[in-house]
Amino acid sequence: MGDDVRVTWRRVRESWARSAAIELPLAVPAQPPAPGCLRVAFLVYRGNPQCGGQGVYTRHLTRELVAMGHSVTVFAGQPWPQLDPGVGFVPLPGLDLYRDPDPFRIPHPRELHDLAAAVELGVMLTAGFGEPLAFSMRARRVLRSRRGQFDLVHDNQCLGTGMLGILGDGWPLLTTLHHPITVDRQLALGHATTPWQRATTRRWFGFLRMQTRVARRLPAIVTVSRSSATDIAAQMGVAPERMTVVPVGVDHTVFRPQPDVAAVPGRLMVTSSSDVPMKGLVPLLEALSLLRADRDVELVVVGKPREGGRVDRAIERLGLRDVVRCVSGISDEELARCYAQAQVAIVPSLYEGFSLPAIEAMACGVPVVATTGGALPEVVGRSGETGVLVPPNDPLALARAIAGLLDDPAARARLGAAGRDRVLDRFTWQVTAMGTAACYRALLDTGPPEGGRGVRGGRHRPQVAPCATDRSLVTSAAKGAPC
């Protein structure tokens, strides 16, 4: 017992030392807006693109908005975002309680300098996730000190209670809701095997009550697929007329075919930003085990499965250590090269609100095998034409689809080319930015938020058409805007 206490205390002190050594990034001023363009405060509570789709969305959308002439300042918590030149940045540091190498750390008392920090720690100590609430409190406080500096606020799925305060302070607020996290909770509960796991899972997802309550009161929501819009309305009770579908995109100058890079025979690739049941890695590993019975295959996992977690245990149980390789922390250019070296890319998710990995692979000209979970059919397209679709959580169907492509070079080439054409036609960040900017204009044309005090700063805003919900309308609305 005494040894355990000493070890714990040593780890706490080591964590404190690491915290003391961390230097906060400097704020970066935003590029001023072009005439007639907007000043946007963009909020993201977790901004690093290597931690998930929210960070990728933040980086590429803000870059394209700035290219259109808008001025964008990103207010972000840890892990910090990667931003392009011209995009402003204001760090809103939290306690970063889940960082490597000391997740669920106990912060030094000096770090508890405000109510938001106390809330963040208190929620973690009761097995919950307090980052969205704490970040929304910090964001509201900072925006109160910047009245008149922005025309609107864009929240990237924080949905903390502080967002209602931001609305009440008079800020026009647009929110991106990628998909309802209620789906994540349902899948996590379905994979919990003990009463304790079910109890802790419910507690961890306790923030969903707050997000649902906030979402129902938001004036304007952007979501990324028709599937997500349907699920948000059904599971969170958001009025459909408040939602607009603007798909996300891919940087097709980075994610492109590389004819000088040879695909490795039998190599498969999957990208997974988190080690959770929803990503479907265990069914994919079971499919890989079936494929090994009559062929040489290997799987590259772009992600970091948790040591001793479900994926790690499945690799061990199925005897796949020698054919599964995990890589993480790589650049977009390195990721594109990984796609080029694969014969088939797989998206085995049980559910996706969109799927950046699917369109990244398609943009690279790599044939995709995906499930029908969530928005994947909407993204990948018709099975057999621009990709191959199979039921979710079906290892045998996955194995058969993958084997069919591995055995048919002509089909791989045909689907790869058709997939890239589909992405270039529908899913680029330029289209995403134009559609988002059209939604900004529509929001501002509605006047100050109900109960707000009007802090926009008096800038003239030309009129535009209402937000569109498909690519052709999004493009035409954006082209009609002066920016």
Go through each PLM region and give its residues.
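Conserved acidic donor-binding segment of nucleotide-sugar-dependent glycosyltransferases
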Residues: 382-383, 388-395, 404-409
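Carbohydrate-associated surface elements
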Residues: 227, 249
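Acceptor-binding helix/loop patch of EC 2.4 sugar-transfer enzymes
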Residues: 102-126, 167-212
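A conserved catalytic-core segment of Leloir-type glycosyltransferases
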Residues: 2-20, 26-37, 75-138
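Nucleotide-activated donor-binding/catalytic signature segment of Leloir-type glycosyltransferases, i.e.
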Residues: 311-333
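Short hydrophobic beta-strand element within catalytic cores of glycosyltransferases
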Residues: 367-370
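Conserved donor-binding/catalytic core segment of Leloir-type glycosyltransferases
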Residues: 261-288, 300
